[in-house]
Amino acid sequence: MPPVLILLTLLLPLGAGAEEIIGGHVVKPHSRPYMAFVKSVDIEGNRRYCGGFLVQDDFVLTAAHCRNRTMTVTLGAHNIKAKEETQQIIPVAKAIPHPDYNATAFFSDIMLLKLESKAKRTKAVRPLKLPRPNARVKPGDVCSVAGWGSRSINDTKASARLREAQLVIQEDEECKKRFRHYTETTEICAGDLKKIKTPFKGDSGGPLVCDNKAYGLLAYAKNRTISSGVFTKIVHFLPWISRNMKLL
């Protein structure tokens, strides 16, 4: 299978191009009610898409590198290209990236989106729980990541329907070998070296879900690598998340 050609030398922010979940499967419609589709437009009118998840009725968590001038969130979607009755499209009132976010090394790649209005909870729209402060995932644990994206590395068209892939949590030492800027305090890496089944060049900000809780946010992948991805470790940022949601 030919390698994916990427412009950046070492690391690629996952939201920089077409959204892709490599491998995986289409999920049952509206079975992931926490998923958010984040659409943004920059000052030149260029559109960008990211993933995210509903953490509270009026807050969505996503990656900081998804920030843009104008942003809207679609909740309750399965087929993002269709006008589904379950969908709720809500403008973003304020984007709050973490103050320590570093765009070069992707440190603290996490952002809260305060919605202009509260989402209405339905069977298709529900928040996802966060882990407890002392909760941890360990190497070998199987988690999942979902998003709207391509079905293979040769497919340039985004999938209209929500897809999900199962990923295995990797050893921190192995992650450090693969990712130059990897920091175990604030990051988790997950994937499967034996299978092409991982997020790659898109779906930034989508949750790494383990035991029905969000343990990570999809951040970046290594150049020419489709076997693993790095996720911002949500547990580390719980105080910041809680503090900012209370302030707004």
Swiss-Prot record:
The keyword Cell membrane does not apply. SUPFAM superfamilies: Trypsin-like serine proteases (SSF50494). Its main location: other. Residues 19-20 form a propeptide. One of its GO terms (cellular component) is cytolytic granule. Disulfide bonds join C50-C66, C143-C210, C175-C189. The lineage of its organism: Eukaryota, Metazoa, Chordata, Craniata, Vertebrata. This is Granzyme E. Glycans are attached at N68, N102, N154, N223. This enzyme is probably necessary for target cell lysis in cell-mediated immune responses. The gene is Gzme. GO terms for biological process: killing of cells of another organism; proteolysis. It is found in: Cytolytic granule. The active site is at H65, D109, S204. Keywords: Cytolysis, Disulfide bond, Glycoprotein, Hydrolase, Lysosome, Protease, Serine protease, Signal, Zymogen. Its EC number is 3.4.21.-.
